[in-house]
Amino acid sequence: MLMHSILILLVIIITTYFTRIWPFMVFNSKNPPNDFVRYLGRALSCSVIGMLVVYCFKDIHVLKPPYGINEITAFLSVILLHRIFKVFVLSITLPTILYMVLVQSHALEKAFFNIHVS
């Protein structure tokens, strides 16, 4: 059983490694990407962000507490941080951490709606 788990982990590690390194092997300085691939790189980044926003807000129930306050707080922190610093990694990482803390601690529910979660 342990050997089976180790083999599964190795396959996952190797597969992940090759999917990450593959673009660098295919598109190097000798073989730059064509215009279509460059276009996809620009267009898909915006599409992925849009998809993540929809995914973030899909389970909000606006008619019952906590009314999506955790999601809205994290979303507003993304906008604020990106307007101030204009650093994508910071704009994504800190609000993600904020959202996780808010969801797991139920801090906003306790503060604004007097909801006590055990």
UniProtKB/Swiss-Prot annotation:
Kindly list the places in or outside the cell where this protein is found, as annotated in its UniProt entry: Cell membrane
- Recorded superkingdom: Bacteria
- Name the UniProt key words of this record, in alphabetical order: Cell membrane, Membrane, Transmembrane, Transmembrane helix, Transport
Q: What is its main location?
A: membrane
> Any keyword Cell membrane?
yes
What protein family does this chain belong to?
Answer: Belongs to the AzlD/HI_1737/HP1330 family.
The protein's name: Uncharacterized protein jhp_1250
The top of its lineage is: Bacteria, Pseudomonadati, Campylobacterota, Epsilonproteobacteria, Campylobacterales
